[in-house]
């Protein structure tokens, strides 16, 4: 429990960190705003935010509005926590069963549970296919708690920046782009790495469910200089973090790489 409380405390501290307005690139921010607004209009999003940060923590662009909400982008954070113990490795095999598993009393479903799940896969493959079960079993094997907290996109980006110094995780996040669900975010101008997700924000019987579609990543993949998060909320399906938020990430990266 102490580790969870410390995590919540660190997230709270992140929220209090002021943004240095002098670090904002106004030209870049205008371009990012246009890219985000175009995609939001295309998918009928009700809100959205895009943030660019350099590796020193300076904000280069921040457009739109973000709020505290669940985020499936926490999976790489939880996996990082497990890897840091040295008790599990990306090459370890876990059984995701038929896409439904009971772990620590909780029923966890992978997105493809109705198609029979992924079965036995490595943890690297588990992250690449966004398997909730694989990450949950990794934390269980390592004896740590999975991180599950409400966060803003800015808080999420700062947490993400803190883990991408881990070379093993960096290789897994690159693999997510080349061989996993993040192919839509791939750029032909520079190698990128990252992770996408979709979270259910609210379910109202009288309305379509609200989803958050998100992508978080960085470039260049080998020596990160900038990290980017894109988060958009929309009503109803389709709702894909990789296809929707990932394409915004790609457009932003291409814009920056062209400078």
Locate each region found by the language model.
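Beta-lactamase-like hydrolase cores
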Residues: 22-53
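Conserved catalytic neighborhood of penicillin-recognizing serine enzymes
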Residues: 88-144
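Sec-dependent N-terminal signal peptides
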Residues: 4-12
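Active-site SXXK
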Residues: 32, 57, 68-97, 126, ...
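Bacterial Sec-dependent signal peptides at the C-terminal "C-region" and cleavage site
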Residues: 12-23
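A penicillin-recognizing enzyme superfamily signal
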Residues: 26, 133-136, 148-256
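Short, glycine-anchored, charge-dense loop/turn motifs used at functional sites
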Residues: 50-62
